[in-house]
């Protein structure tokens, strides 16, 4: 690492006086349960005030799918950690399996349906700390 890179690293724009606002203890998180699966938020503006992103873990039970929805203020990146499913994407459909990632642009209607025998686990991330979602059903 060159000297200019070290200088830039030491010039933080965010004062780091209280690191607790930057940390999340997953043992203390609340999981939202639905008929189709669960959502656990790891980082967002509510958990970490000032966060410019939202990150969560989504579990979808076999044979189930989350409702068709879209996001008003952000795009989404979904990375499959395990399982297989069909991802509805603005009227089209694509098969997703562990190791695959899909980017969903702002305003695109989408949902994920588990077509396999094991629970889907996926990491979801949004480029806003205050994700806005509109459900169509």
Name each model-derived stretch.
Residues 41, 56-71:
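Conserved short histidine dyad/triad with adjacent acidic residue
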Residues 58, 78, 102:
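Conserved GNAT-family N-acetyltransferase fold
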Residues 64, 73-74, 92, 108-109, ...:
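A generic "binding-loop/recognition-motif" signal
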Residues 92-106:
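Short acidic-glycine-tyrosine-enriched beta hairpin
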Residues 106-131:
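Ligand-binding loop in jelly-roll beta-barrel domains
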């Amino acid at each position: 690492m060159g000297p200019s890179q070290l200088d830039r690293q030491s010039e933080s724009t965010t004062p780091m006086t209280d690191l607790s606002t930057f940390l999340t203890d997953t043992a203390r998180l609340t999981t939202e349960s639905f008929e189709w699966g669960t959502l656990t938020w790891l980082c967002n503006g509510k958990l970490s005030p000032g966060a410019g992103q939202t990150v969560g873990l989504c579990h979808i039970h076999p044979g189930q799918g989350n409702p068709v929805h879209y996001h008003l203020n952000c795009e989404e990146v979904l990375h499959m950690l395990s399982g297989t499913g069909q991802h509805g994407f603005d009227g089209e459909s694509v098969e997703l399996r562990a190791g695959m990632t899909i980017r969903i642009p702002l305003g695109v209607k989408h949902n994920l349906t588990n077509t396999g025998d094991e629970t889907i686990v996926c990491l979801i991330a949004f480029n806003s700390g205050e994700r806005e979602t509109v459900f169509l059903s």
